[in-house]
A protein has these predicted regions:
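A short helix->loop->beta-strand "cap" motif at the edges of active sites that frequently abuts
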Residues: 15-20, 39-41, 117-118, 176-178, ...
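Rossmann-like dinucleotide/phosphate-binding beta-alpha-beta segment
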Residues: 84-176
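Rossmann-like dinucleotide-binding domain for NAD(H)/NADP(H)
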Residues: 43, 170, 176-210
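Rossmann-fold NAD(P) dinucleotide-binding segment
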Residues: 6-19, 32-35, 160-180, 191-195
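Short glycine-/small-residue-rich Rossmann-like dinucleotide-binding loops
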Residues: 4-5, 26, 150, 156-158, ...
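Redox-cofactor binding/interface segments in oxidoreductases and associated redox assembly factors
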Residues: 1-2, 23, 153-154, 182, ...
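Phosphate-binding beta-alpha-beta segment of Rossmann-like dinucleotide-binding domains, i.e.
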Residues: 39, 47-96, 108-111, 115, ...
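Phosphate/diphosphate ligand-binding glycine-rich loop within oxidoreductases
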Residues: 1-73
Length: 210
């Protein structure tokens, strides 16, 4: 039973009586599933763990980013706060939220954010149209989501397919001044490409998992 400890092939080899690895959490990218399969070890996760908490946290981070809360807080503590230091900030009610990955957390995020943003769009190639709530507009590619969204919230698991998925091509399709929140796994975002997008002004106030 674990939460954060990595279960590698070496760990599995050193525990010959191991029968099951059960993770407290939805993701299991820290578990070497191939090594477990070879050793006959079962792997289990907790798919409903923290769904509401992560979705609420993602929305809070998105709003903090849009309203420049962190910078304002820093300025207040430094005694340099000025109400126009960030210029005119956008209203979420005029913005489109784009969700990458419409699983449990992505759907909860869409549900709690739908009355905050003007529109909610989502990309998830593994779902059929009937799996999309009525208040979520489906987009059919990451590039389409990048073009439509003012705020991008990432809720996809880390797999060989999604590793580095948000890269230079994705950022190039974005509007200038887009906000990015990644509460999934840091490796989904190509960090060097993100830094270039940040330097160019395409991305504003990015928040991403490590």
């Amino acid at each position: 039973l674990l939460q954060y400890a990595p279960i590698t092939a070496k760990v599995i080899a050193g525990m010959p009586e191991l029968g099951i690895v059960s993770r407290i959490g939805a993701g299991y990218d820290t578990v070497d599933t191939e090594a477990c399969e070879k050793a006959g070890v079962w792997v289990a996760n907790s798919p409903d763990y923290g769904v509401g908490e992560v979705a609420t946290h993602a929305l809070a981070l998105a709003l903090a980013s849009i309203r420049n809360i962190v910078a304002y807080n820093r300025d207040i503590h430094a005694g340099t706060w000025y109400f126009q230091s960030s210029g005119t900030l956008p209203r979420p009610s005029t913005m489109t939220l784009g969700i990458v990955g419409l699983g449990r957390i992505g759907k909860r995020m869409a549900h709690i954010a739908r009355n905050t943003f003007k529109r909610v769009v989502a990309y998830d190639p593994y779902l059929i149209d009937g799996d999309f709530p009525a208040y979520v507009e489906r987009v059919h590619s990451l590039a389409e989501l990048a073009r439509e969204a003012d705020v991008v919230s990432v809720h996809t698991p880390l797999t060989s397919e999604t590793r580095g998925m948000l890269d230079a091509r994705f950022f190039a399709a974005m509007k200038r001044g887009t906000y990015l929140v990644n509460t999934a796994r840091g490796a989904i975002v190509n960090v060097p490409d993100l830094l270039m997008a940040l330097d160019s002004g395409v991305i504003v106030n990015p928040i991403t998992a490590s």
